[in-house]
Design a protein with these regions (language model features):
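N-terminal targeting or regulatory segments adjacent to alpha/beta-hydrolase or S9 domains
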Residues: 2-9, 21-116
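A short loop-to-beta-strand scaffold at the N-terminal edge of the catalytic core in hydrolase folds
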Residues: 115-127, 134-135
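Catalytic nucleophile-loop/oxyanion-hole region of alpha/beta-hydrolase
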Residues: 148-152, 170-205
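Hydrophobic core
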Residues: 11, 15-19
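Short amphipathic alpha-helix adjacent to the substrate-entry channel of hydrolases
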Residues: 150-168
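Short beta-strand element of the alpha/beta-hydrolase
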Residues: 133-142
Length: 274
């Protein structure tokens, strides 16, 4: 091989190496979500998809996605929440584009392998602009069917983030996956995950706030009780408890819940307390 051929070969290798980062670069979306963005456009945003943020707040069945995909965010979310909801999704996009891990599994891979329903329990992370402060954990409602991580969760997260807090939004098991006190267990494990990784999340582990809505409000109220809540994990007790229109009366649902999700059990369940 002559000198010229050797130089050409070296240059070719260098050129290929220089192109590798571009070839393997993660596709990023633009933070351009508005109330007029359709749900299909929102869900196909590369950064929303890549982040793993769960946006199916109204679809009980997969086929319902076909109905909602061409509806706008303004049609999907409540009018009083839609602006903050859009900004929350833009914040998710910005965080993802900046290398932030948005979605965190609450349970270990081994636990999820043994019980796949645990894979649906997740935290969505909104880091504060200034690290080292207190955090808020948002527990959205679920209509006893599907949870509202994007609508109630996202809109509350955006407002709290603007106040300077690090915010986590909890996706917990619901409806037929809610047996054996699953939603309460998910909340406990979520706080445990944050507490054990406080340095990684750059938050203070104590005096956190629980910001809860509807059925999530019921879970937050139970979790604030040491005997049946936070003391079982163990984690620090909440410093602040904000319950917005909490669901507090299972009088007409206890029998249905027992039959559907906990048939035959006589042990305490989260929906039998009130």
């Amino acid at each position: 091989m002559n000198k010229r051929s050797l130089i050409a070969g070296v240059l070719s290798v260098c050129l290929m190496l220089a192109m590798l980062p571009a070839a393997f670069a993660v596709e990023q979306g633009e933070a351009n979500i508005t109330p007029q963005t359709t749900m299909k456009e929102l869900r196909e945003n590369p950064s929303i998809k890549g982040s793993g943020y769960y946006t199916y707040c109204r679809e009980m069945l997969p086929i319902e996605s076909l109905y909602w995909q061409n509806k706008t965010l303004a049609q999907y979310a409540k009018p009083e929440l839609v602006e903050d909801c859009a900004q929350a999704m833009n914040l998710v996009i910005e965080n993802y584009n900046n290398g932030v891990q948005v979605t965190w599994q609450i349970y270990t891979p081994e636990e999820i392998e043994a019980n796949p329903s645990l894979g649906g329990a997740q935290l969505f992370y909104y880091p504060a602009s200034t690290p080292g402060g207190k955090y808020a954990l948002v527990v959205p409602g679920n209509g006893n069917g599907v949870t509202s991580e994007m609508e109630e969760g996202g809109s509350a997260a955006y407002q709290l983030h603007e106040m300077g807090y690090t915010v986590f939004v909890l996706r917990y098991r619901s409806f037929l996956a809610a047996s054996d006190n699953a939603p309460l267990q998910d909340l406990g494990r979520a706080v445990q995950l944050i507490t054990e990784n406080a340095d990684k999340f750059q938050v203070q582990s104590e005096n956190y706030a629980l910001v809860c809505f509807s059925a999530g409000g019921q879970l937050g109220g139970l979790f604030a009780n040491r005997e049946i809540g936070y003391g079982n994990y163990p984690v620090p007790k909440p410093g602040v408890l904000l319950l917005s229109y909490p669901f507090v009366d299972f009088t007409y649902g206890k029998l249905a819940y027992h039959v559907l999700i906990d048939p035959g059990t006589r042990e305490w369940r989260y929906y039998t307390t009130i």
